[in-house]
Amino acid sequence: MRFKIYTLALIPVILFQGYAVKKNTPRLAEPKGERIGQKGVGKSLSLLILGDSAAAGVGVNVQDDALLGSILKELSSEFSIQFYLQATTGFTTDQVIRSIQTLETQHFDVIITSVGVNDITKFTSPQAWIAKQKQLYQILKNKFSPQLTIASGIPPMDQFPALPNPLAWLFGQYAKAMNLELGQFVAQQN
């Protein structure tokens, strides 16, 4: 309820700031590099990474420097890793859910998700977002039977340099509330 009140009270400023941010903030490309493959030696491990621009690695030039590359560097001396990166800049939780419907049913040992920033920019309430997260995790469980699922939290959007206040503050409040909901959901899974 409070998010509706905050959002409604700030609508004139948010609309202006949102337009200015969208117009003036450069769009970074997703990094080049393999999104599907095998790397390393040792015990077999299958990895699926799902999400938005953070999962895709936006902000670096090559996948070797992104989340996927960092994980492969750390684990490839002990594991033969079959990896699959299914992440797209701008994706919301709904879009991630739709994208995994196109994947074959198979087993992944580990699944990492990173999604939520774009849900915030669409003003998805924390309650609606966590409901979508629960739906996502049920689909992941049923379709891929992972041994481990790792949920990345939403970054502190109030600290994004491209966002002016009060837009940064409002998005930061959404992020904090969503991370709290996500933490409670994850704690119930163990």
Label the model's feature ranges.
Residues K39-G40, S76, N142:
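Generic structural signal for beta-strand residues in well-ordered domains
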